[in-house]
Amino acid sequence: MKNITILGATGSIGTQTLDVIRKEKEELKLVAISANKSYKKVIEIIKEFKPKYAVLMEENAFKIVEDFCVNSKIDTKVLKGMEGMIYISTLEEINTVVTSVVGMIGLVPTIKAIESGKDIALANKETLVVAGELVISKAKEHNVNILPVDSEHGAIFQCLRGNKKEEVKNIIVTASGGPFRGRKKEELIDIKPEHALKHPKWNMGRKISIDSATLMNKGLEVIEAHFLFGVDYENIKVVVHPQSIVHSMVEYKDGSVIAQMATPDMKLPIQYALNYPNRKESQIEPLDFYKISNLTFEKPDMDTFLPLKLAYEAGKKGGVMPAILNGANEVAVDLFLKGKIEFLQIGDLLQECMNKFYKSMEATLENVISVDKEVREYLGKKYDI
């Protein structure tokens, strides 16, 4: 039996993780959850799974859930804020922490969980993007597995198993291309949030959907792959694959390319991470090769989708530059969703902040938190948010 904590239990990945646990109750036990403010969903989770702990970040939501548990005579202990997230990430009984919160908020709990010897099922891209070197070194120090939950890194992880790192030539990360695949910059001038939120293949949260539309999501995955698999940026390629059947590939120096293929369903990488190193019965629809008409691959347009290009630049620059990129992107996406900036301005703001805030300094926890704060305060004042 593996005991599980889910950080971000009410979001897209968290909800699908619950689906996996629901079907594997003999092997997986939900011990603790966290959420921001979705108290109705948290109450439903508590009713069904009866976790020992639930953490809410927002004060009002915390009080509502706490009152519910007291009045319903449910034993779930309700905690609040970052202290609560760290507490449920470091519980002695926990084997695996699923980090599916979005943004920088997942960084500190993830590091604390690693220091406590917990395996990490990582769905929070930002953690590795802003502090990849620190996270990977701590994982090695504490003999902890970092198990990628997203489909691309989960695919690469599987393609690498049983092979030697020195035999790898290239990692090939596939991208659906998002809702605006094939469009040129002039065709993206009047894009509204409702257009960008309509992903052709995946059902995701709002922030990740916008990142997919700008190809920033793929840029973050490139940086993540660099740290996860120890591969130079020159050897990490992005290929647009609109069918989303091939989830990523590894090219070896002898010319062999190993690909991981599956129906596009996040429950597969979640299930693989939670059960690693074992495989369990499938919870997804199997591939029917007779129904797949074709598989196509295209080169990404980095001039139109500037964030992908900037992610490569930030990764190669290293230090705190990925943290600057990430902080600027989180704010820019929020500004776009609120109608304060245009779609193409997202890339412009990333470029502006990378130029303005870069300092030659090591990506320590203190430094990345500091530069992230600077970027957010600057954009907050600029746009009065």
UniProtKB/Swiss-Prot annotation:
GO molecular-function term, one example from the UniProt record: manganese ion binding
Top-rank lineage group of the source organism: Bacteria
Annotated Mn(2+) binding sites: D150, E152, E221
Binding annotation for 1-deoxy-D-xylulose 5-phosphate: K125, S151, E152, S176, H199, S212, N217, K218, E221
Cofactor(s) needed by this chain: Mg(2+); Mn(2+)
Catalytic activity entry: 2-C-methyl-D-erythritol 4-phosphate + NADP(+) = 1-deoxy-D-xylulose 5-phosphate + NADPH + H(+)
This protein's pathway: Isoprenoid biosynthesis; isopentenyl diphosphate biosynthesis via DXP pathway; isopentenyl diphosphate from 1-deoxy-D-xylulose 5-phosphate: step 1/6
Residue numbers binding NADPH: T10, G11, S12, I13, K37, N124, E126, G205
InterPro entries, sorted: DXP_reductoisomerase, DXP_reductoisomerase_C, DXP_reductoisomerase_N, DXPR_C, DXPR_C_sf, NAD(P)-bd_dom_sf
E.C. numbers: 1.1.1.267
Any single biological process term in GO: isopentenyl diphosphate biosynthetic process, methylerythritol 4-phosphate pathway involved in terpenoid biosynthetic process
SUPFAM superfamilies according to UniProt: 1-deoxy-D-xylulose-5-phosphate reductoisomerase, C-terminal domain, Glyceraldehyde-3-phosphate dehydrogenase-like, C-terminal domain, NAD(P)-binding Rossmann-fold domains
UniProtKB keywords: Isoprene biosynthesis, Manganese, Metal-binding, NADP, Oxidoreductase
Protein purpose: Catalyzes the NADPH-dependent rearrangement and reduction of 1-deoxy-D-xylulose-5-phosphate (DXP) to 2-C-methyl-D-erythritol 4-phosphate (MEP).
Similarity-based family: Belongs to the DXR family.
UniProt name for this protein: 1-deoxy-D-xylulose 5-phosphate reductoisomerase
Organism for this UniProt entry: Clostridium botulinum (strain 657 / Type Ba4)
